[in-house]
């Protein structure tokens, strides 16, 4: 028996955030994933993180840019949490938000194309 899919009106509304890491140090994909999760937990707490549903999508170590997904209602909360992240494993950093979009395709075209994303 095949399960029915939810209609679009009942699905979670997501937004995608493009970010850039400004640092002299290099970061791996796993470090960035942990960084996003820990920054969210530190600022929003467990309940806020559960409601924001941050989800790491992609990271390019060459340009130090990436994409993270979150719930539409908590975009500003997650941006604030990322902004407050200043160090990770002894490495100093700044996370700059490049922009927010409803689709990954538009996010890449509008905010990440200048960094070589296609």
From Swiss-Prot:
Catalysed reaction equations from the record: Endonucleolytic cleavage of RNA, removing 5'-extranucleotides from tRNA precursor
GO cellular component, as recorded: cytoplasm; ribonuclease P complex
Enzyme Commission designation: 3.1.26.5
Signal peptide interval: none
Main location: cytoplasm
GO biological process, one term: tRNA 5'-leader removal
Cellular localization per UniProt: Cytoplasm
Keywords: Cytoplasm, Endonuclease, Hydrolase, Nuclease, tRNA processing
Pfam families noted in UniProt: RNase_P_Rpp14
GO terms assigned for molecular function: ribonuclease P activity
Top-level taxonomic group: Archaea
Complex formation: Consists of a catalytic RNA component and at least 4-5 protein subunits.
Function of the molecule: Part of ribonuclease P, a protein complex that generates mature tRNA molecules by cleaving their 5'-ends.
Family statement drawn from the similarity comment of this UniProt entry: Belongs to the eukaryotic/archaeal RNase P protein component 2 family.
Protein's name in the database: Ribonuclease P protein component 2
Originating species: Pyrococcus abyssi (strain GE5 / Orsay)
Underlying gene: rnp2
